């Protein structure tokens, strides 16, 4: 597999876990404005080395998910801001421009040190 993007969660905002109950995980790179940081999983920003598209594999810690849809600005947001909203609903069409949809259950064991990646499943 080819890694397209990899980063490590460094902090978890006080309200970030609440979004998981709505099947949503919101990330932002370190240095996010304080009012946003409260709702985000903060990470040390990695380099985006390819395009985000359906068919990639998203992983968080030991959990693996197929990417089913990518919003029109999700790739730019990730590249520039380290920001992406992940939805664990398996939709085949992005609900919002900044959203990446994946299929599978919401992870319940996210902690600082968890590695987040997007990988190509084809060589």
Curated annotation (Swiss-Prot):
The keyword Translocase does not apply. Induction: Regulated by an unusual system which consists of the activator GutM and the repressor GutR in addition to the cAMP-CRP complex. GO terms for molecular function: kinase activity; phosphotransferase activity, alcohol group as acceptor; protein-N(PI)-phosphohistidine-sugar phosphotransferase activity. Gene3D superfamilies: Phosphotransferase system, glucitol/sorbitol-specific IIA component (2.40.33.40). Residues 3-116 form the PTS EIIA type-5 domain. The keyword Kinase applies. The active site is at 43 (tele-phosphohistidine intermediate). One of its GO terms (biological process) is sorbitol transmembrane transport. Changing residue 51 to E: In strain: ECOR 58. Its main location: cytoplasm. GO terms for cellular component: cytoplasm; transmembrane transporter complex. Keywords: Cytoplasm, Kinase, Phosphoprotein, Phosphotransferase system, Sugar transport, Transferase, Transport. The modification Phosphohistidine is found at residue 43. It is found in: Cytoplasm. Changing residue 17 to T: In strain: ECOR 6, ECOR 28, ECOR 35, ECOR 37, ECOR 51, ECOR 58, ECOR 61, ECOR 66 and ECOR 69. The phosphoenolpyruvate-dependent sugar phosphotransferase system (sugar PTS), a major carbohydrate active transport system, catalyzes the phosphorylation of incoming sugar substrates concomitantly with their translocation across the cell membrane. The enzyme II complex composed of SrlA, SrlB and SrlE is involved in glucitol/sorbitol transport. It can also use D-mannitol. The EIIA domain is phosphorylated by phospho-HPr on a histidyl residue. Then, it transfers the phosphoryl group to the EIIB domain. This is PTS system glucitol/sorbitol-specific EIIA component. It comes from Escherichia coli (strain K12).
């Amino acid at each position: 597999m080819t890694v397209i993007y990899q980063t490590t969660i460094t902090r978890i905002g006080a309200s970030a876990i609440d979004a998981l109950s709505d099947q949503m995980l919101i990330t932002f790179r370190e240095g996010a404005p304080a009012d946003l940081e409260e709702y985000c999983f903060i990470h040390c920003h990695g380099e985006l080395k390819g395009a985000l598209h359906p068919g990639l594999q998203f992983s968080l810690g030991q959990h693996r998910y197929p990417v089913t849809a990518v919003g029109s600005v999700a790739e730019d947001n990730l590249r520039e801001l380290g920001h992406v909203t992940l939805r664990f609903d398996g939709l085949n069409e992005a609900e919002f421009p900044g959203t990446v949809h994946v299929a599978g259950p919401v992870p319940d064991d996210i902690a600082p040190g968890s590695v987040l990646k997007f990988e190509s499943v084809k060589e």
